[in-house]
């Protein structure tokens, strides 16, 4: 879809949704096709005027709904900065996620970079309390896992007791990178080579663009990146951190130390993903195998993978160790 077509669809859908009252919008979302439910929220697919729309419902806690905190990008729960990392984090708040979608949508509409899904509309909608996701369901265990602090407990219990959602209406891109790339790699030959070249180029372009503008994604695995087969779209900003947020001193220091995190993370993820997909190594074997390749070992016997696929492009061009600075 061209930039002009995306902007045109944005105008139509954004206007249509803005005209809906809360009750009608709630009914529209409730009638959508369920896609999933996870730690980041419930997702559905629906159509607005014939245009497919992806809807994400992010829990909005009572603390975030207080007048003094509405739209605040501050760390209102006082979470430790290391909650930016990893699987199962309670995340820092819905308003931060919204702010990033506003940023990225404006970048797309201004023609600065196309690699983000547009946000057509957002609304705070009431709804019944929902069970916590599996990763946080054991509140005491989750609190302990994230350092045991009182802020972590307030955050998780706030999510548990939430009776409203920040509902995001986003451009629908039907494929995530994980699923799409598996098909391309299975095809082998030129299809694999073209796909890997596009992915490598787009990962670098997208992370460089975000990071140069003070935005760190922090969760850019391949199920959080979408594709139309021609470019990548970075999505799911539940852990994103911007230098333009209202940051405390600890977060400013954390941000400064992690400016290269996205680039290292995406390179690491691509390499490990390819080795696992092509050769099927377990995690410990995979790390040893990647290091051996980067150090120039195994080239003769590993020209093709176990299914006859070529070894990941450019692996031996990075044997000087630059890649390994990002690969655990």
Residue ranges and their predicted role:
Residues 233-327:
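C-lobe/activation-segment region of protein kinase-like
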Residues 1-53, 60-68, 278, 296-328:
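Regulatory N- and C-terminal appendages and interdomain linkers associated
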Residues 60, 125, 175, 228-243:
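Activation segment
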Residues 165-176:
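Conserved short submotifs of the Hanks-type protein kinase catalytic core
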Residues 212-222, 227:
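Catalytic-loop of the protein kinase fold
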Residues 28-167:
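Conserved ATP-binding subdomain of kinase catalytic cores across diverse folds
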Residues 206-210:
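Conserved hydrophobic alpha-helix
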Residues 185-199:
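Activation segment of protein kinase catalytic domains, centered on the conserved DFG
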């Amino acid at each position: 879809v061209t930039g002009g077509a995306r902007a045109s669809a944005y105008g139509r859908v954004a206007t249509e949704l803005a005209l809906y009252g809360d009750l009608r919008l709630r009914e529209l979302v409730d009638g959508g096709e369920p896609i999933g439910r996870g730690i980041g929220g419930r997702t559905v697919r629906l159509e607005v005027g014939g245009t497919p729309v992806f809807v994400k419902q992010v829990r909005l806690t009572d603390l975030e709904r207080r007048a003094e905190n509405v739209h605040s990008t501050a760390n209102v729960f006082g979470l430790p900065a290391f909650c930016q990392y990893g699987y199962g984090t309670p995340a820092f708040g819905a308003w931060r996620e919204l702010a990033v979608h506003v940023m990225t949508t404006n970048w797309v509409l201004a023609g600065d970079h196309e690699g983000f899904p547009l946000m057509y509309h957002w609304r705070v909608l009431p709804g019944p309390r929902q069970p916590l996701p599996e990763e946080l369901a054991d509140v005491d265990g989750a609190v302990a896992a994230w350092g045991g602090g009182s802020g972590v407990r307030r955050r998780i219990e706030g999510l548990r007791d939430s009776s409203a959602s920040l509902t995001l209406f986003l451009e629908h891109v039907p494929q995530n990178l994980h699923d799409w790339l598996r098909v391309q790699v299975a095809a082998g030959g030129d299809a694999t080579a073209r796909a890997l070249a596009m992915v490598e180029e787009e990962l670098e372009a997208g992370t460089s663009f975000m990071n140069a503008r003070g935005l760190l994604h922090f969760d850019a695995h391949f199920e959080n990146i979408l594709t139309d087969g021609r470019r990548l779209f970075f999505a799911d900003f539940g852990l994103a951190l911007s230098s333009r947020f209202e940051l405390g001193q600890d977060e400013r220091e954390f941000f400064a130390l992690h400016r290269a995190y996205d680039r290292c993370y995406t390179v690491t993820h691509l390499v490990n993903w390819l080795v696992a997909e092509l050769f099927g190594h377990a995690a410990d074997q995979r790390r040893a195998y990647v290091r051996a390749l980067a150090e120039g070992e195994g080239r003769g016997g590993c020209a093709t993978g176990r299914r006859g696929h070529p070894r990941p492009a450019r692996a031996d061009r990075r044997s000087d160790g630059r890649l390994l600075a990002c690969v655990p």
